[in-house]
Amino acid sequence: ELVKIVKEHGMSLEAEVGSIGGEEDGVVGMGECADPKECKMIADLGVDFLAAGIGNIHGKYPANWKGLSFETLAAVQELTGELPLVLHGGTGIPDDMIKKAIDLGVSKINVNTECQLVFAEATRKYIEAGKDLEGKGYDPRKLLKPGADAIVEKVKEKMILFGSDGKAE
């Protein structure tokens, strides 16, 4: 029913299958792997994107993280065909794992935590340097600019890693 409503309004729909680890919107998951057959069932409903749990985690990764399950990702890709796959919890995943996930069909990678972290760090440095006390440095446009600039630089870095740099029309 939701797929029909979304299509009628020219929107896209992304489904998340399996438990993505970490905390997102107050829900805590352990990072289990999705069942590829369940992913196929959800894909067959007509969703536009599929985010399958493959050991990924929202937020920061713990030191004892086991890594992504490429076996699960390959099985999901095989069963769902050309459906674009999404990797939630992309922050902190090593570059070689990101590239392998892309090779196995991931076409969207969420890295919001990474953007939040660089924003907070740059804003903190601005305040700790006392720049908010100089002239009108307290102006939100000035106060938040270092953080916004840090996000821009992080996104550029990720676009190169993800292979999307220079592809916009």
Question: Which ranges hold each PLM region?
Answer:
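Short, acidic/turn-prone active-site loops that include or flank metal/cofactor-
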Residues: 113-116
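Metalloprotease/metallohydrolase-associated module, dominated by Zn2+-dependent proteases
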Residues: 145-147
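Active-site neighborhood of phospho(di)ester-bond hydrolases with catalytic His/Asp-centered motifs
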Residues: 85-87
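Active-site gating loops and adjacent loop-to-helix segments of metal-dependent hydrolytic enzymes
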Residues: 128-139
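Acidic, glycine-enriched catalytic cores built around paired aspartates
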Residues: 151-153
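Alpha/beta enzyme core
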Residues: 1-83, 95-109, 121-124, 129, ...
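Short acidic/histidine-rich active-site segments
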Residues: 89-93, 111
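Charged interaction scaffolds used for protein-protein
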Residues: 141-143
